[in-house]
Amino acid sequence: FSGGDPVHLAEVFADTPMWKAIVQAWHEGASLAGCSAGAMAFGGKIIGIRRSHITEGLGLIPDIEVIPHYDKFLGWLPDRVTAAIVRKDANTALLGIDENTAVVLTDQWRKYGTGKVHVLRGEFELSEELFPYN
């Protein structure tokens, strides 16, 4: 799933036969990748960086919210990133993924690339090379 507008991606794919087939294939072992907005759309909620509200995501991984380009957005739009973090659902983990960085889920979550992955759960921030998700 490519970048662009995560809300548009979620609206277009939600509750469609295509999305159901994608989820089934993923559960059966197919690879699935989300870049930028695509990664945001996979969560249960989409945190508004461009928009100031939270929107329903596709729910593939319902208890995460993603902010891609975290290091860039934090420099460009610090007030919006801070507001997004404050609006974060208390029951979810927020993944702030820096530029040139990927998070891959196999048996565990792993970080690849030159940047960091900022994991905010509750009031704590974790950032590790290899981190357990649960």
Name each model feature, range by range.
Residues I46-G48, S52-N134:
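C-terminal and late-domain segments of enzyme folds
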